[in-house]
Amino acid sequence: MVAEDEITARRALELIRVEYEEYPVVLEAEQAMAEGAPVLHEEHPDNVLAKMDLRTPMPESDFHSVEDVLACPAYYQFRGRYDTQQVQHCHIENPISYAWMEGGRIVVVTSTQIPHIVRRVIGQAMGIGWGSIRVIKPYIGGGFGNKQEVLYEPLNAWLTTQVGGRCVRLDVSREETFQNTRSRHPISFDVAAAVDGDMRLMARSCTAVSNQGGYASHGHSIVANAVTGFRQLYLDRIGHHSTAYTVYTNRPAPGAMRGYGIPQCNFAVECMMDDIAREKGWDPKAFRLANLMPLGYVDPFNGITCHSTGLAECIEKGADFIGWAELREKYQNQTGPVRRGVGMACFSYKTGVYPISLETASARMVLNQDGTVQLHLGATEIGQGGDTVFSQMAAQAIGIPTEDVHIVSFQDTDTAPFDTGAYASRQTYVTGKAIKKVGEEFREKLLAYAAELFPDASGLDIRERQIVDGAGEALISLADLAMTAFYSLEHSVHITAEDTNHCKENTFAFGCCFAEVEVDIPVGKVRVLRIVNVHDSGKLINPALAEAQVHGGMSMGIGYALTEEMKFDPKTGRLLNGNLLDYKMPTSMDHPELTALFVETDDPSGPFGNKALGEPPTIPVAPAIRNAVLQATGVAVNTLPLSPQKLVEEFTRGGLI
């Protein structure tokens, strides 16, 4: 419905009557996969969108398969099941876009992470040339993956063509955001492991079933990424077998969300590690240290290499901060209704999407008349602090102060260089390489122009906004050089540089979380007393922003662990809590002090030794809290969230109530 104003549109909607043919509600993936289940899409009669089955190459041994290892009586055998829930991104700004026609072209202003991709999808959807579409992303904040999908912009672009090119605003409410945009996939994991007496993982298997809701969205890629992450963090000495299913149901369709399947798999693998350690009487920290991904590890399927790792140092640093050894001993064998525990979890996370998908980014630099530099990017700032870091990178590559770099903080596909956008913790790694490359080219152009002005000088360099010679003598300021370049009758030139980084490498970021909790058993209440994340994200470009990024991710992880869940009426399939009153996000009043620590490594594949940090802080929080509850109570809770009702049921089943 398109109307002059919102009131008219609402009145018109009330005049529309829709008749629905009701079908049985299928909300769970297991229901949808059962024989005789209603078929949601005719092209997938079993409701399975996709399936994958991966086996690592087996070394020469007496074992012919992973299953043989998992049945070998010489090893300790573990089996378990872990389930995660559906949650929403809850970015403060809901999806919104404006569309109008200008000079025969469609202009769309939208809150998006991927403006260049939005333009392409609009063109494909409408069957028109991409050059006849202009997409503008203003300076906005918040997306977490939900604005990585093109949902409303093609509709809005089409609507403006139906009203004579007039401006159309498509503003999505919070309730519509919950119901009709994307969310995090609920995924179930059935896992098995074989472990020898020296705490070494010999083999593991994982079967993951992802609830895709009614539409494909990112499809199978998220659960595929999840089982890949399950394989990578720890080393299997003999072999690994993973199977993954993506299944259609009647839920709202999940899609990309911070971590892209890794928070789900991390809950499974880190709960499994603690459960094994508890059954064997091992220290969970020592068990993890005995099995970490080694430096130089190469994934057997995608070839991603571990170029640097500080994970062992992260674990020790976090353990020292929380007082791991002392608290583990102190909190053993507790009694009473209120108990405390300490838990941990580790993670690995790749940086960007290569080699699974394209990784490319471009940058442009333009000399201003006062000697400062204009930086143009297609990479998007969505609140993560990217523009600040990009300015720092450009300044370092050129050799000028950061305040002399003026970044264009919005993207316009008519003028911005191409970049695929903000997702996969890629921008400081992929776009950063483009910035470094262009910055070095720009620097050489400045020095080459200075050499024309001072042909007898040698060893030219840029220092403190000056061109200096090999002896360190100042020859000309950058401001004067710029004025000369613009207005000299003999040497006028507009100094610019532009280039592309087609990234064909990847690397792993690492880290861990330690949490101390207090559990009120009779009421099922978990209070986080202390929590610390320790990250190896390579070299930190901006430590203050890095700390802020970690704090935000930890907050999101606490909600994932304890309170957040999209709930549905099992009879009708209706979402019951699609608003910020009934959907329980934690606030600052629910958090302890959030501590972020770092172990800096110098990753040789990163533009400045840096690697992923955007998504990782969320990943290990939920399993660390769950494992702390396990130590406090002795009860293994294998589903998220750890809500009071669920905990009371589990504690009752465990004989504590």
Label every PLM stretch briefly.
Residues 38-126, 291-372, 499, 576-587, ...:
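Helix-loop-helix junctions that connect adjacent transmembrane helices in secondary transporters/permeases
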Residues 127-132, 161-168, 197, 223-347, ...:
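C-terminal catalytic domains of large/alpha subunits in multi-subunit enzymes
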Residues 1-50:
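Flexible, low-hydrophobicity surface segments
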Residues 139, 143-165, 169-170, 386-394:
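Thiamine diphosphate
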Residues 351-415, 421, 431:
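Catalytic phosphate/nucleotide-handling subdomain of diverse soluble enzymes
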